[in-house]
């Protein structure tokens, strides 16, 4: 397996990216914190978002000292604690970063929401944080529950669109409000019409909360969800989970990077999506003991699995090429008025 690529001074874990097709360059956005905080686990509560670039995930240009804090908590804003995993997309007039954060004064300080930041320059070291706060609602747990195996989950947004439906969808790592404690991990689905996207980004219009993409009743957490196309026509819903939270009947408790095949995602009438929310037929793409977590499939590299090194930190290729293909993540025709 290829070596982990380390930042010269920071501990690095979850990442997401935008691929510049003209330059053939990956813009990586990554969580990072002081290495001195790792042993105590406090790095999760001091994380900011950094920016780096790479041609192939074999070598990474980490930029200068300003590059590891391009997005960080803002005093006086609801996102006043550490920043957690997100997604980045290009729109006609710039770039949007969907991210996870918390209001430290709310509940136990661990209640999460999705926020949005904007820049017109992907190389910028200062993103403009919008006031938008997308909170958990509908069937999804709104705060931590006493006795649960893990705290609240409403994080790790992943966006795609179906142009034929004029709809934009967002997946979110979540928990069911009425699920069994310790088995309530789920993947939420939200949507908004193309015409309302700009208003939804600025908080002037609401997202529609749909039934979960997955609510199998056998995971405490289903983190960093993503959706891809399989070359043979199905779709693959992927996510990460730790072995100690994996109670699925088909995975032997291995945890790690897993997937669920969705055979008929697209309805013939092109109205909505047909997930398999109760299916327990998960496959392990890479078990936790391979020491990669919060993995992403990189369609531009033959669907190779890339994640962060859960032992040493840093970003590492797996050498495993799934051949999974990207959903439509082209938002370049949409103008967002910020």
Question: What positions do the PLM features span?
Answer:
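Carbohydrate-active catalytic/glycan-binding domains of CAZyme proteins
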Residues: 1-338
